[in-house]
Structures are given as structure tokens and as C-alpha cells.
Amino acid sequence: MSDLFRGAPSDMTAGHPTTRNLTSAPDAPPAEPTGPISATYPGQADQPAGVVAYGPDIPTEAQYRLLGNVADKRVLQLGCGSGAEATALAGQGARVVAVDPSLHRIEVARGTIERAEVKVELHQSDLAELPFVRADSIDLAVSVYALANVDDLDRVFRQVHRVLHPESVFVFSLPHPAYAMLDPDGGDPPAVIRSYFDRGSRPWFTDTDQGEERIRTISELHTSLARTNFRVDAIIEAEPTDTSPSPFWTTAMRWAPATLIIRARKEGI
């Protein structure tokens, strides 16, 4: 499913179906949504306007400057979130193609685009299936936390490599594997509840979606990028900002970076 959507002023908001019934019994109250940050960020985050935010409570693209000038560039966004990143990029003159497997997130992004009155091409699709994007047609690829919910990351990387121009940049953020070791609801200092080398996934669900977060070590990510012909040129273990904490803030963020940001460049053809 895809559409080319130009926002227009409207008092209407798009409706969305739930993916499934999450109640445990007909007469039971709905269970509380649960899961790691990647279950709700950036989709439920109150993000700064006009700039790409890579994670909660860390500096934005305005400080990191990983993307460069996006004006007149064709940008692929993997994972729509709330549509804030696509809107920010389109507002800076980029021609944005945004992809997400979730119909709900597509509808939320459409509403954000509508309010901002910008133009974004939306596709509902698996992140590893991009038949609607021609080879060597993308100038820049971006993803914020969405790859945490991907099972076969190499497959996604191969697709991104296919559609990027040679030497073009791919910037993405993920949960930092060190932060995943800590109890976010624990004390100060937080307790270690998971091995750094634990490859197990962490299931999550919200009112509209569900999935499994997969934590990957930095070496695993670097190896996956190398074998799909990407060259890593920046790794950022994001330190928290000194501003007022967001609803995503936990004490554990003072002890380990919650967000890992990687910039890689396409090599070869």
C-alpha cells in the first residue's frame, strides 16, 4: 500500500484500526501497554519541530550534523514513527519516501504531514521489501529506532544498499546494547538484569501494535554493515542532554547511553 500525500489544513484526523484484540478475556480490562523504548519511540514522543531527533533525551541532528544539507535530496526513511522526522526533512526541501510495516503508524504520519502541509511519499511495506524504489535512486537513508524491531537486519541493509547512490549516507539509531543490560525502573545505580551478550528478543505491545525488540552488540552491527558493503564512518554513544527530562527518561540513562547512532556510507555498486 502506498500513496503520495500532500498535507492540507483540516480539522479531521485519520482513524486507524487496531492490529488485534489485546484483552485477555471479553470482560477483562485492557492490559497496560508494555515494552522497551523502541515500542513507543518515536511514535509516541513529543519531538522538537523541524529537526530529526535520534532518540529521547539526547541532542538532535541540529547538534550532530550527520545528514548534511538535505535540500533537493531524495531521502528514504525506514519507519515512520509519528511522521515528525519525515516532516522535518520535507520542510528542509527533501523529497521524502517514508516506509513502515504498520498501518497505524502510516496513518499517524499522514496526520502529521497534513498539519505541516508538506509532501511525503508514504508506503506500507516490510522494511526489507522496497520494490517501489529504484536502484541507485536515493541520496540519503534515515531510520530512528525502527531497525530494533527487524529480525533479518542484513536483508534490510542489502535493500538500503541497493537503492542508495554510491557513497551516499545511511544514518540510523537503535537502542544501545549497554543500556539494555540495566533495569530502567531500578535504583541509582541501576541493577544489571541482562548480559551484554544476550541475543534474546524482548516482546512488546501497545494499544495498536506489537513486536519484538532485538538488541545487537556494536560489533554485530559493524559486521552486518561491512558484509553488506557499507563503511562505518561515525558511531555515537549519545550522552543525555541537560534539558528537562522527557517521559522516556530513566535513571539508567545517567549510567549508560540509551541510544546508539551509526552513520555508514555505501561502497561499491
Question: Can you annotate each of these PLM segments?
Answer:
Residues R74-E129:
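Class I SAM-dependent methyltransferase SAM/SAH-binding core
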Residues L174, A178, F205-E220:
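Acceptor-substrate binding/catalytic loop of class I
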Residues S2-A71, A84-A88, R105-V108, T112-R115, V169-P203:
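Conserved class I S-adenosyl-L-methionine
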Residues G211-I235:
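Short alpha-helix
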Residues D154-V169:
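A short glycine-rich, Lys/Arg-flanked "PGG" loop and its adjoining helix->strand segment in the class I
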Residues D139-D154:
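A short SAM/SAH-binding and catalytic strip from SAM-dependent methyltransferases
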Residues A128, F132-L140:
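A short acidic, Gly/Pro-enriched loop at the edge of an enzyme's catalytic core
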